């Protein structure tokens, strides 16, 4: 890669239609796990103008009011007015859940005991990543993109910018020099708004109140290109503007394109699905490698076969930044992390109802108490085993 280059990532707000769907799916998952932690859940959601469709496969002993959960989630996000295209009080909610296929269940239904040979819920490959660009050990472009739409939501909720509406998108382009963030080049922010606000006033307020307070001062060098609502009017948004579906923001959910993605979405899936649990484990492993000072960048790939507990492969790539060889780090990963599906569930305590919070503003790089995969609690052991000094700054 060139020594001087631009890299871009994007995020979307909790009111984006795909994120509405993700949050409904994970709210349903949480409600089920709160009653029956051994449930099998694959909850998919579609939302459009005035309509929510809940479908998928659920096997559980829990007694859940799915319709009320969908309405409560839509209300929490802020769609509480028919002018917004969907209103939690009046939208139609259709429910079409089936049970998990017994052909799938036979390989994974060993969860009620301590048998660590519970098989993976599907085949697939998953990635984890960490780097030293931020205290959270995340790539800077996706980190800033998340913080922008998160701030947009906070300003909407507290009434400081009362004309903001729930749907928004952000995009941040960072200039890198010698592989390190050098400066912010471009910030794009498109936000849904009330019809009475004029565009010049909106753009000024968004730049001054949303964007500038979010950007690191040391990366503001020269003129930054601010593109706020570049198409102009953005009154129609949310599920009215676009049909929302669970699992369509997998790059937003992870590393903003800075690392590969195995293709499996997260939301609505219980942790027997390695699409979710192994991706969380990959982040946990990668973050501990970087926190331990073994490398400044770490990419983990892990893969599985359906019904088989042991991963079919584990790979570590530190992109030449490792203080010991990638082969040595891979060996340490196998020694210090149990990457069998049941081992991951136990290691990260994943049978808790913790998932709705993950469904907006990124699954990774957020220091929430529930996000066990963000802990750097194995960094010291890894550093000692490798014979290196652990990294000093870990969020």
Swiss-Prot record:
L-methionine binds at residues 57, 100, 242, 273. CDD domains: S-AdoMet_synt. Residues 100-110 are annotated as: Flexible loop. It comes from the Bacteria. Mg(2+) binds at residue 18. Binds 2 divalent ions per subunit. GO terms for biological process: one-carbon metabolic process; S-adenosylmethionine biosynthetic process. It catalyses: L-methionine + ATP + H2O = S-adenosyl-L-methionine + phosphate + diphosphate. Its main location: cytoplasm. Its cofactor is Mg(2+); K(+). K(+) binds at residue 44. Pathway: Amino-acid biosynthesis; S-adenosyl-L-methionine biosynthesis; S-adenosyl-L-methionine from L-methionine: step 1/1. GO terms for cellular component: cytoplasm. Its EC number is 2.5.1.6. Transmembrane segments: none annotated. Keywords: ATP-binding, Cytoplasm, Magnesium, Metal-binding, Nucleotide-binding, One-carbon metabolism, Potassium, Transferase. GO terms for molecular function: ATP binding; magnesium ion binding; methionine adenosyltransferase activity. It is an enzyme of class 2 (transferase). It is found in: Cytoplasm. InterPro entries: ADOMET_SYNTHASE_CS, S-AdoMet_synt_C, S-AdoMet_synt_central, S-AdoMet_synt_N, S-AdoMet_synthetase, S-AdoMet_synthetase_sfam. ATP binds at residues 16, 167-169, 233-234, 242, 248-249, 265, 269. Homotetramer; dimer of dimers. Catalyzes the formation of S-adenosylmethionine (AdoMet) from methionine and ATP. The overall synthetic reaction is composed of two sequential steps, AdoMet formation and the subsequent tripolyphosphate hydrolysis which occurs prior to release of AdoMet from the enzyme. Belongs to the AdoMet synthase family. HAMAP family: S_AdoMet_synth1. This is S-adenosylmethionine synthase. It comes from Burkholderia pseudomallei (strain K96243). The lineage of its organism: Bacteria, Pseudomonadati, Pseudomonadota, Betaproteobacteria, Burkholderiales.
